[in-house]
């Protein structure tokens, strides 16, 4: 399957292969298709890190990026996502990167669109490339996932990052802890155990802090930013309870002094900006997979890819 909608649809072997490819890109290996390839990034939600790192990855691979601005497209005239995607497929785009506010937007495209689609985030659903860059960061630090404890802290219910990470970390042999305000618990997520934040911080090898998803809340948060930070944030006091070799992750954007004390964002334990760096390598690996498997699915079985080292 050339599409990447969720990590749950990939085997552990496929996930590890993507991480290995990403690590090779980090070490300076390059891959180029033998002919021009065209990519369109369809972002229907605001994005800095995901959009820019996809564009960086595409340019590093020598791919041609087709500009797309949802606010200036026919979407504003009522065109559906399906028709937008089919239009780009018809004009010859080789792969599509899509972020959309609708959960599981890709289900209507799964069996009707042959062009590979990479999910860059669907509503409160999934964020596979964020999970992959988190996995790469953890793997670089610990060399394995088995036996690790990962604490996911914050707005669990509305976070696609929490959903994606909890599932894949469990499959890879890690223990997942959740900690959040009562109203933001996701009781439908079977992959973690809820504990209080102090227990989570003390037991975790990996502390994953989540941004408060204000744009997905039907009601305003019942706490002030200061109250949230005191009760559920990674404060200086809580950070002192961390294990000797534990690390801090955050998908960003970071609300400083809300989810995490500002001085901890670039502290010795933080890998937040390392995650962003790894995002480029992971997305290079994902794009390579999409184009290779997309061409195979379309009958180009005898094409050979050029690997430049």
From Swiss-Prot:
Positions with a binding annotation for carbamoyl phosphate: 49-50, 99, 127, 130, 252-253
Coiled-coil regions, chain positions: none
Highest taxon of the lineage: Bacteria
Record flagged with keyword Cell division: no
Pathway where it operates: Pyrimidine metabolism; UMP biosynthesis via de novo pathway; (S)-dihydroorotate from bicarbonate: step 2/3
Presence of the UniProt keyword Transmembrane in the record: no
GO biological process, any: amino acid metabolic process
Binding-site list for L-aspartate: 77, 160, 211
Gene3D superfamilies with a match to the protein in the record: Aspartate/ornithine carbamoyltransferase
This protein's GO CC annotations: cytosol
GO molecular function: amino acid binding; aspartate carbamoyltransferase activity
Reactions catalysed: carbamoyl phosphate + L-aspartate = N-carbamoyl-L-aspartate + phosphate + H(+)
Keywords annotated in UniProt: Pyrimidine biosynthesis, Transferase
HAMAP family: Asp_carb_tr
Family statement: Belongs to the aspartate/ornithine carbamoyltransferase superfamily. ATCase family.
Description of how the protein assembles with itself and partners: Heterododecamer (2C3:3R2) of six catalytic PyrB chains organized as two trimers (C3), and six regulatory PyrI chains organized as three dimers (R2).
PANTHER family hit by this protein: ASPARTATE CARBAMOYLTRANSFERASE (PTHR45753:SF6), ORNITHINE CARBAMOYLTRANSFERASE, MITOCHONDRIAL (PTHR45753)
Function recorded in the entry: Catalyzes the condensation of carbamoyl phosphate and aspartate to form carbamoyl aspartate and inorganic phosphate, the committed step in the de novo pyrimidine nucleotide biosynthesis pathway.
Protein name: Aspartate carbamoyltransferase catalytic subunit
Species assigned in the record: Geobacillus sp. (strain WCH70)
Upper lineage: Bacteria, Bacillati, Bacillota, Bacilli, Bacillales
